[in-house]
Regions:
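N-terminal beta1-alpha1-beta2 submodule of the flavodoxin-like/Rossmannoid cofactor-binding fold
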Residues: 1-65, 71-76, 82, 91, ...
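Short aromatic-enriched loop/helix-cap "lid" or pocket-rim segments at secondary-structure transitions
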Residues: 25-30, 109-110, 135-140
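A polyampholytic, Gly/Pro-enriched intrinsically disordered region
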Residues: 36-40, 114-122, 142-154
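Second-shell loop/turn segments in exported
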Residues: 66, 99-102, 160-161
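"Short basic amphipathic alpha-helical interaction patches in structured regions
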Residues: 75-84, 109-114
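Short, glycine-/small-residue-rich phosphate/pyrophosphate-handling segment
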Residues: 94-135
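Glycine-rich phosphate/pyrophosphate-binding loop and the adjoining helix
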Residues: 134-211
Length: 284
């Protein structure tokens, strides 16, 4: 996506890596991955290394690229948005968000939008790139990638991650941004990526995300109350939660999916309104 911007001699593109003070492992041990669940969902930032940025500098556009962890912005992005540097950099600045995730990003984006509003930033576009192997297959493929470090650890598992062709095709977004940035010196106030397929909304996942987010909020508060990340009590609580989650997935989730399919005709108009809302500001 950034290639068209980098190739322009009349555009200065700066990169700011967000480095956790305590690096996250990859592959990620199973229980350690869940230990950060409460802080991630509750958006309690974990420390970053000092940010190598001049926060007094004014930018015409800021692109925030982040992953989704537990239906929430990843910890590094949460920490950045809580920093004094972000408060200075983003105030009054047009922002484009770029999401890379398995398939569910709506609730994470809602949380990030709220934080951007608090900082006085202006969200003008959103891009979401999701796993190519589909919702059902990625439910297995993505965790295996996370815990083994390999995108295709077994021959019978589809390759996890965003398709290379989709990543290459994202250059169209960079081209649209470059065209707008060089068109004039006026502030960017309107979406630049309308009609380019910046996001795709799967209406079947909207209700699931809302229910999942409410459940995550409840369990996060309970687990956080048990003790710090490395405490024995939190580990025991996490084992109970993971067992509960697995039971939920094999029982309630299939029944819920069937029920939603049967009731879909009754909520068609509402679903279309929700799709249009979550597709904003860029649209499908």
């Amino acid at each position: 996506m950034c290639a068209p911007l980098q190739q322009r001699g009349d555009i200065q593109l700066d990169f700011l890596p967000l480095q956790p003070a305590q690096p996250y492992p990859f592959p990620w041990p199973f229980l350690d991955f869940f230990r950060i669940f409460p802080e991630t969902v509750l958006m309690r930032p974990q420390p970053l290394l000092p940010l190598a940025v001049d926060s007094s500098k004014r930018y015409d556009l800021v692109i925030l690229a982040y992953q989704v962890w537990f239906l929430s912005p990843s910890q590094p992005m949460t920490a950045f948005l809580a920093s004094p540097e972000a408060a200075q950099l983003l105030k009054g600045t047009p922002v484009v968000t770029l999401i890379g995730c398995r398939n569910m990003w709506l609730m994470a984006q809602e949380k990030l939008k709220q934080r951007l509003n608090e900082l006085g930033a202006r969200l003008v576009d959103n891009i979401a790139l999701t796993d190519a192997c589909g919702t059902a297959a990625s439910f297995l493929a993505t965790p295996l990638w996370l815990f083994t470090g390999r995108q295709k650890p077994y021959s019978w598992v589809p390759r996890a991650g965003i398709d290379e062709a989709e990543i290459a095709a994202a250059s169209r977004f960079g081209e649209a941004m470059a065209q707008r940035l060089t068109a004039d010196s006026l502030p960017i106030e309107r979406p630049m990526l309308t009609g380019l397929g910046a996001v795709r909304i799967d209406e079947k996942l909207i209700a699931s995300e809302k229910v999942g987010n409410r459940s995550f909020q409840l369990w996060s508060r309970l687990l956080a109350a048990l003790g710090p990340q490395q405490s024995r009590r939190r580990a025991v609580g996490l084992v109970v939660y993971i067992a509960f989650l697995l039971c939920l997935i094999v029982t309630v989730v299939p029944l819920s999916a069937l029920l939603k399919k049967l009731l879909a005709p009754l909520f068609k108009e509402r679903t279309q309104r929700e799709k249009a809302y979550f597709a904003g500001p860029s649209g499908e």
